[in-house]
C-alpha cells in the first residue's frame, strides 16, 4: 500500500540519519579519524544488506523494512565522510578545493543516479536497480580498500615535501 511504502521510505531515511551520525562517531573513536576505513565498512555493509533484500523477496514485510533500514544506516556514511577525507589529505593548502571537488562528484552522482534508477526500473525492473546498487557498492568498497594503509591526513607528507624544498 501507499502508506506502507511511505513508512518504509521514512524508516530508511531515519536510519540513514542515525547511520551518518554513527559513521562520524566511529570514524573518530574506532578508526582514529581515518574516514576511508569507515567508508569501506559502510560500502560493504550497505551492499550486504541490499544483497539480503534482493535474495529473500518473500521475507515478512517488517523484516524487509528492517533490512532496507539497515542498508540506509550504512549508505550515507561515505557521502558525509568523503569531503572530510579529501580535505584532510589535501591539508589546509587545498582542503576547500578538495572538499569542493568531492562535493561536485557527489551532486553529479546524485543527479544521474536519480535519473538512472528510474530508467533502469522502467526498462529492467527493480531487481536490476538493486543489482546495480550492489555493484556500485562493491566498486566503492574496492576503491576504499585500496586506501586502507593511507594515513589519516596528508600533513606528514606535506611536511616532508616542504623540508625537501
Give names to the regions the model predicted.
Residues 44-58:
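C-terminal ends and interior cores of transmembrane alpha-helices
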Residues 61-77:
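Hydrophobic core of transmembrane alpha-helices in multi-pass small-molecule transporters
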Residues 53-57, 126, 132-165:
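Multi-pass alpha-helical transporter architecture, strongest
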Residues 20-33, 121-122:
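Helix-to-loop junctions at the C-terminal end of transmembrane segments
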Residues 32, 86-95:
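Paired intracellular helix-loop junctions of major facilitator superfamily
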Residues 34-37, 119-136:
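A membrane-interface helix-boundary motif in multi-pass transporters
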Residues 29-43:
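Cytoplasmic membrane-interface "Motif A"-like loop-to-helix N-cap segments
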Residues 92-123:
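A late C-terminal transmembrane helix in Major Facilitator Superfamily
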Amino acid at each position: 500500500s501507499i502508506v506502507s511504502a511511505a513508512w518504509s521510505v521514512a524508516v530508511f531515511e531515519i536510519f540513514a540519519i542515525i547511520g551518518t551520525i554513527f559513521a562520524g562517531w566511529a570514524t573518530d573513536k574506532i578508526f582514529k579519524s581515518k574516514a576511508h576505513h569507515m567508508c569501506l565498512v559502510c560500502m560493504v555493509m550497505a551492499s550486504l544488506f541490499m544483497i539480503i533484500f534482493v535474495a529473500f523477496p518473500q521475507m515478512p514485510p517488517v523484516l524487509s523494512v528492517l533490512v532496507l533500514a539497515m542498508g540506509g544506516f550504512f549508505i550515507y556514511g561515505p557521502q558525509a565522510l568523503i569531503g572530510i577525507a579529501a580535505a584532510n589529505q589535501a591539508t589546509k593548502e587545498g582542503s576547500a578545493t578538495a572538499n569542493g571537488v568531492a562535493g561536485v562528484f557527489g551532486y553529479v552522482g546524485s543527479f544521474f543516479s536519480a535519473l538512472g534508477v528510474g530508467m533502469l526500473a522502467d526498462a529492467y525492473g527493480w531487481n536490476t536497480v538493486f543489482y546495480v546498487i550492489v555493484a556500485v557498492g562493491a566498486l566503492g568498497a574496492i576503491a576504499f580498500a585500496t586506501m586502507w594503509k593511507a594515513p589519516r591526513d596528508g600533513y606528514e607528507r606535506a611536511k616532508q615535501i616542504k623540508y625537501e624544498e
